[in-house]
Amino acid sequence: MSGNKDSDGGWKTFIWNSEKKELLGRTGCSWFKILLFYVIFYGCLAAVFVGTIQALLLTLSNYKPTHQDRVAPPGLSHTPCPEKAEITFNKHELETYMKYTKGMKEFLELYDETAQLDQLKYEDCGENPGGYKNRGDLESDIGVRKACRFKRSWLKDCSGLEDRTFGFKDGKPCVIVKLNRIVNFRPKPPNSNESIPEDAKAKVRPNVIPIYCTNKKEEDAGKLQEVKYFGIGDGFPLQYYPYYGKLLHPQYLQPLVAIQFTNLTMNTELRIECRIYGENIGYSEKDRYQGRFDIKITVNDS
């Protein structure tokens, strides 16, 4: 028992020694010195860290990407974009395709002419393909840049203005396609027809990035039949590039291409691939949306 009392007294004395006025073996002065040391030490570390970050930020621009040499070519996005990129519906049953047309209507609201009336934010860039629209350097001294208008009506049968079902009720579905944004990227039209499929060569024209859709599987040849393209030059016109970023180009509207499959084989799953072609457009097996996209469409008629 006496041993326990001695040990109890030992650790209690270690915690607080009333004779020496020590807490955990240190006097108040000692504790003050060591705390002061760590405050100064970690304060200096924090100052070095903050200074390094600040120096790095001074080398970066809020408007212009510093390093773009490893940026991949832009991808293609399409609407509707269901899970697994599969569009399946019955043209006689509204509820089977309403979810697709609803998403398309919401997406195209930004392209309503009434949303592009502000002369300080938007400008007309022509209804025919043109060259790049340069609006100065990627700096803030010029201020916010105007955006080219893109009229929804240019998508014609796929605009949703006359046919609010976007062709779905007739078994002729539309897909709206856009080229994803990359700051200061200038897509270059193909400079040679060698890399373009024979059937797609007719779509090559000046100042346009062409897009072409075909069957993915050889056994589906002949089942896709007629495909219509709507938009400026039936592709992506160069006057909508470059994009200056969110801060300098907040109203920017990407040019759209509407693709309508007007004569699909009914009650058959078709896998379709759409590609854009350009000198600085590449493809990747790891990214199925880089410069292209695959989609499965099944139109039921029973």
Swiss-Prot record:
Extracellular side: 52-302
Glycan attachment positions: 193, 263
Membrane topology of this protein: Single-pass type II membrane protein
Post-translational modification, as annotated: Glycosylated.
Major localization class: membrane
Highest taxon, organism lineage: Eukaryota
Bilayer-spanning residue ranges: 31-51
Gene3D superfamilies named among the record's database cross-references: Na, k-atpase alpha subunit
Keywords, alphabetical: Cell membrane, Disulfide bond, Glycoprotein, Ion transport, Membrane, Potassium, Potassium transport, Signal-anchor, Sodium, Sodium transport, Sodium/potassium transport, Transmembrane, Transmembrane helix, Transport
GO molecular function: ATPase activator activity; P-type sodium:potassium-exchanging transporter activity
Disulphide-bridged cysteine pairs: 125-148, 158-174, 213-274
Annotated GO CC locations: sodium:potassium-exchanging ATPase complex
Record topological domains on the Cytoplasmic side: 1-30
Triggers of expression: By seawater acclimation in sexually maturing migratory silver eels but not in sexually immature non-migratory yellow eels.
Entry comment describing in which tissues the protein is expressed: Expressed mainly in epithelial tissues.
Cytoplasm found in the keyword field: no
Tagged with keyword Endoplasmic reticulum: no
GO biological process: intracellular potassium ion homeostasis; intracellular sodium ion homeostasis; potassium ion import across plasma membrane; potassium ion transport; sodium ion export across plasma membrane; sodium ion transport
Localization terms from the record: Cell membrane
Recorded family membership: Belongs to the X(+)/potassium ATPases subunit beta family.
Quaternary assembly: The sodium/potassium-transporting ATPase is composed of a catalytic alpha subunit, an auxiliary non-catalytic beta subunit and an additional regulatory subunit.
Protein task: This is the non-catalytic component of the active enzyme, which catalyzes the hydrolysis of ATP coupled with the exchange of Na(+) and K(+) ions across the plasma membrane. The beta subunit regulates, through assembly of alpha/beta heterodimers, the number of sodium pumps transported to the plasma membrane.
Protein name: Sodium/potassium-transporting ATPase subunit beta-233
Organism: Anguilla anguilla
